Amino acid sequence: FNDVGQSADFFLRTLEDDASNVALLRQAFLTQYYYGDIEQAAALGRQLEGLNVVVPLGGEPATALALRNADWPASIVLADRIAEDGQALAMAGVIRGWSLVAAGQGDAGISALLEAGRMSIDVDSGMPPFFRLHAALMAERLGLVNEALQRVTGLEADSLPSHVALDLAAFYARRQKWDIVDRLIDTQLSRQFNQTDVRAALEQGTRELPAIQQYIAAAVVALALSDNKNSGQSLAARLRFALFVDDDHHFARLLLAQQLSDYGQTDIALANLERIPDGGMFGQLARLAESAVVEEAGDSERSISLMKAVADRDPGNAYLFHRLGDTYRRNSMFRQSRNAYMASLALGRDTGGLHRSLGVSLERLGETQAAETHLLRAIEIDPGDAYALNYLGYWWADEGRKLDQAIAMIERAVSHRPSSGFFVDSLGWVHYKLGDPARAVGYLERATELEPSDPEITGHLGDVYWALGRREEAMFKWRLALTLSDDAEEQALLERRLRTGLTPCLLYTSDAADELRS
C-alpha cells in the first residue's frame, strides 16, 4: 500500500506489453482501484468480466460510475454483480436499496436495505445503527415523515459513531427538532469537533435534502467502518468509492488522509486534508490531523501554528489546549506546554493524562513540588497509569528520594506494561540505586532486549555490569551506548566511563554533572 501509486502505474505499463496476462490484469485492476482511478479500474473490470474472471471488488468501480452518473437502472443491475462477492453482500444491498428509491421503487428499496441490515447483525450488538437511520432517510426521501421519525425513535440515546450521529442530527435538523440535535452534538461527539461549527453546518443543511449519491457515499463509509474484517486496502477502496460518488464527502476524505499518512504518503495526505475547508462539520478535525501529519514529518513550527489557530478558533474547548500543550511538550517547549495545560485545567478539564503531562512539564522546569502534586493527582485519577507511575517512581529513584515508594510505583508500572523496556529499565535502575546490582541486572538485561537501540538503557546495564565486577562486558555496553547516543552530555559521560570506569564514589549514583566535574 505504501507505493500503491507506483504499483498502479507499474502494472498498467506492464500490461501494455502483455495484455492477455490475467494475473497482471487482476493486479492492474486492484491497484487502480486502491489508487482511486475509478474509471480506469472500471475499464479493467470490464476486461476481466469479458474473460469470465472473478476478482474481489470486481463490480465496484463500474457501479461507482453508474451512481455518479445517476444511472439508477444500471446501478441496480451492477449491485447484483457486487453481491457475487460474498464479502460485499451488505454493500450491494445498500446500493441496490438507494438505487431503487431513486428509481421510484421506494418500498422495494427499504426492503433491500433492511435485508442487508439483517445480514450484518452481530450476535452481541445487533444490527448496525446506520441501517435504521438509512431506512428513515429513505422514508424521508419518499415523503413519509412519520414513518421516518418512527424508525429512528430512541436511536439518539444509543452509543453512536460520530459520523452516524452527525447524519442523525442532520435528519432531526431538517425536522426542526433542535433539542435532539443539541443533545446529539453534546453527547455523541468528541471534543475534537468544533460544536459551534457543527451546529452552523446543520442549520445550513436544512435548506434541501442531500442528493442520493451523498446518502450512498455515507452508507458505504459507515458500512466499511463497521466491518472489522476489512483490510487497510479494502477500506481505502471503499473510501475512494465514496469520494468518487460524492467528491464533497469530507469525512471520507479525512479518513483517507489519515490512512495515507499512516503509510508514509505525507504529501498526498496533506493535499487531501487541505481540501477540507475550515468550519463545517469536519474542518477542525482536518486541521488537527494536518497538525499531527506535519509534526510527524518534522515541521514542528507549522504543527504548533496549526494547533494554536485551532485553539484560537474554539477558545472554550479544554481538549484543544491539552493537545496544544502536548505539541509544545513533544518539542521540549516546557514553559509553553505548562501554560497550555494550565489553560486546559482552567477550562474544567480534569483528566489523569492532563495532570501527568502537566507534571512532566513542571518537573522539567524545576517546579518540583507542583510537578509531584500533579503526577500524584494523575495516579489518583487512574491508579493504573503506567506512565505516571514510572515517571514519578523513576524521578524519585534517580534523585535517591523515597526509594521504597519509588520501587513500588515502578513495579506497578511494569505490571501494567511488562513489554515496555523503559519501565523495566526503571525497575532495574532503582534496584541498582538501592545498592542491589545482582537484582538489578536481570531487569536491565531484559530492558535492553526490549529497547536495544536506547543508549541510556544500554549505559545503565554497563554500570550494573561494572558494579558486579564484569568489567569487559561493562566496557562493551558503554561503547555500544556511545554509538547509539546523539546527546553531547551523555556522550561525554560515556567517554569518561570508558577512560576511568566507575570509581567507588560514583557507584550507585546518577548525577552526570558531578561525575563530569570530578
Give, region by region, the residue ranges found by the protein language model.
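Position-specific recognition of the canonical hydrophobic site in helix A of tetratricopeptide repeat
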Residues: 33, 67, 101, 140, ...
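Start-of-helix register in tetratricopeptide repeats
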Residues: 23, 57, 91, 127-130, ...
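Canonical tetratricopeptide repeat
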Residues: 27, 61, 95, 131-134, ...
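Conserved small/polar residues in nucleotide/adenosyl-binding loops
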Residues: 508-516
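Structural marker of alpha-solenoid helical repeat scaffolds
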Residues: 17, 50-51, 85, 119-123, ...
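Residue-level recognition of tetratricopeptide repeat
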Residues: 30, 64, 98, 134-137, ...
